Each structure stands twice: as structure tokens, then as C-alpha cells.
Amino acid sequence: LSDANQTRLKLSQKQFKRLLALVQYAMAQQDIRYYLNGLLLVVKGNEICVVATDGHRLAYARETLAEQLPSIEVILPRKTVIELSRQLQENDDALEISLTPTQAQFRFGAIEFVSKLIDGKFPDYDRVIPKTHDKLVKLSRQTLLQSLQRAKILTNEKTPGVRLVFSNGSLKIIGNNTEREEAQEEIEIGFSGETIDIGFNVNYLLDILNNVTTEEIECHLGDASSSA
């Protein structure tokens, strides 16, 4: 890569592999909005963040860097992201990234990986992320994951929706289908206030829960008509 307009950064293979895992499931696959068929990589100051969206959901993750760097935003193609995820190791060995407005270079171990970038304008992700949700619910990731997996069994394959009903002290998870079959589970939670009944695509929730590693997750809620 040419040294002109180049931003270089260094972090561990494990750190970057983890960042990719936290968002890559939300990338579009064959969207006519070609800039969605990839992942936005942003370097700003001492932070690196990655963002992916398919127009229905958005995933965002960030990591602190050891130094202050010039700002740059690039869109990595979907194939590049998937290949990097496959090649990077779960270790603390160094990964060197060099970015220009048209190319990205990744060096790790004996591998030197160069990719063209997607030329396009990624959506303003910061506007999409809710800032005013004032209701916070903390949940066991594993408990919620298992409940959603069971509820999914009775959802329609084409429209796999579940309802999450938050009320005082409990969360009801309801899955049903066109045959009028219904599955319902209840989890004890620390929630008080007006009941909130929200519908979600269960696969979107499972994608999140299968890719985060924390034992506890936080859910920020507005009302039944708001994103979460």
C-alpha cells in the first residue's frame, strides 16, 4: 500500500477476531444497496469500531487502541470479513492493519491479506442507536438464549416472530404459528413499570446471544413501538 493517506494500527488477533464476531452476522448478503454487503470499520482517536447492518438490525462494537490515530472510515467487503474471521487466531499475537481510502492490508503470522474496499456511503449508524431509552433490564444470556430456542420451535419458518412481554418482575416469551400452536415461558427479571409488549424476529435475537460471551446482557427499552 502507498504511504499516502494511510492509517496504521496494531492490536491482537484475538481482539479483532472478537470485534468481527460481534457484528458480522448483521451484514447484508445480496442487497442492491451494495455498501450494506460489508462491514464499516472506523478508526477515530484511540478507538476502533465496527458496524454492520442489513437494514433491519444494526450491530456495533468497539475497542480501545493503545495510541491516538488519524480518523478514517472504510467499508470491508463481506467476503473479506468472513475470510479474516476464519484466518485470525484466538491469541495475543499481533495484527497490523493498514488502511487507505481504497485498500486495506492485514498482516498477521505468515499471512499478508490485501483487500479492495467498497466505495459507498454507509448509513449514519449513530442516529439509529437509541439514546433515550430509560428502562434497563439485565438478563442471563444463557437463560434467555435457551428460552428463545424453545420458543422458536413453534414459530413460522418464513416469519419467525416472538413476543417479549416485560412486566413487573417477569419476562414472558411467546412463540406461535398459523396453526394456532403457542409456546410460552416466563423468566424472573428485575423490571418494574408499565408492561411493554414487543415483537422480534427470533433469529435476530439468537444471532446476538450466540455471538456475545458475557454471562449477563443489558436490554435498554423505550416503549412497545420503539427499537431496543
Q: Which residues does each PLM region occupy?
A:
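Structural preference for solvent-exposed beta-strand-turn elements
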Residues: 1-228
